[in-house]
A protein has these predicted regions:
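Conserved, structured core segments of small domains
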Residues: 1-102
Length: 102
């Protein structure tokens, strides 16, 4: 599992994806969030990561940690369907690291 030092190292508008509490990247597929929470408290961010069992995305922007429960799917179609059902703004394409807006 990552620790607070990992979160402190995030620059503004920086993030990472976790699987089982460890940073991970993929060469293909799509990452989609099903729910999320935000906090300015780094200890609360760690609590949320543990609550999601380390299967989440972490984004840091302007002093706020965004913690999203997320998972990888194979197709854009599936990612967009889940994203829309869960009222997400966008999904991430691993191949290009670009966003597709729901």
């Amino acid at each position: 599992m990552i620790n607070i030092r990992t979160l402190r190292k995030l620059n503004n508008n920086d993030g990472l994806t976790l699987k089982g509490g460890k940073p991970i990247t993929y060469k293909s597929g799509w990452q989609v969030a099903t729910e999320g929470k935000e906090t300015r408290d780094i200890n609360e961010a760690m609590r949320l990561i543990r609550e999601y069992k380390g299967n989440c995305g972490v984004w840091y922007s302007d002093g706020v940690y965004y913690i999203d429960k997320s998972h990888r799917v194979n197709t854009k179609r599936e990612a967009m369907l889940i994203g829309r059902q869960c009222q997400q703004i966008s999904v991430l394409c691993w191949r290009t690291m670009g966003l597709a807006y729901c």
